[in-house]
């Protein structure tokens, strides 16, 4: 009788762990945080790649910091992906097929994106000035904004 009771308890305990064994990642907050981080990382890296891929390392950092500044502003959405894919904000969105043609530029964009998502201020000037906008030097938009600086082929702006 004692043997039967012990065996029953062992079976019951074993069965209670089956859902975890079937899918160990279900409802795992650490896994979910990792998945969300990877999603935001890819959005940031794509934006850096398509907006500043040919720019210097500093130029890439500045573009990433603008995205971070927007995430921290009440004027814009609250996640990197929402900021990047917000309608009419970045010229590449909707105009590229997503193909990564330059592996080196992509790797550097990923590295800058990771830095942007894990460090507080990656580009001091853009961060301190709260720059929220930039454009290529090849265009001349009629913006009523305060010009902060030019880095490479981009001019950065903040609200007045």
Predicted feature locations:
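Bacterial extracytoplasmic/cell-wall-associated proteins, especially those involved in peptidoglycan
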Residues: 23-160
